[in-house]
């Protein structure tokens, strides 16, 4: 079992996704497209987080979260998608 130093919460919509660092409460908004995904990873790295020490959590929003899921997997980030009805 991994021991993560922080968790990131995402709120994903059609055009944007919002990210919050749980430890500091810092917030940032990114476009929900590949350019935004890349900016999100740079933002994480500026805060000292990478695939080895952060867990990303978000609600499964179907198509809106699908491309981000693929991107995070490709970059070897751990993430949890929660079903909206739970």
Please give the residue ranges for each predicted region:
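Phosphate- and other anionic-substrate recognition elements at nucleic-acid/protein interfaces
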Residues: 1-86
């Amino acid at each position: 079992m991994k021991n993560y130093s922080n968790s990131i919460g995402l709120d994903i919509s059609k055009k944007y996704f919002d990210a919050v660092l749980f430890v500091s409460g810092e917030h940032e908004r990114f476009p929900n497209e590949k350019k935004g995904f890349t900016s999100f990873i740079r933002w994480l790295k500026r805060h000292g987080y990478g695939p080895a020490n952060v867990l990303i959590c978000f609600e499964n929003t179907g198509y809106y979260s699908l491309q981000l899921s693929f991107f995070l997997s490709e970059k070897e980030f751990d993430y949890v998608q929660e079903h909206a009805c739970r």
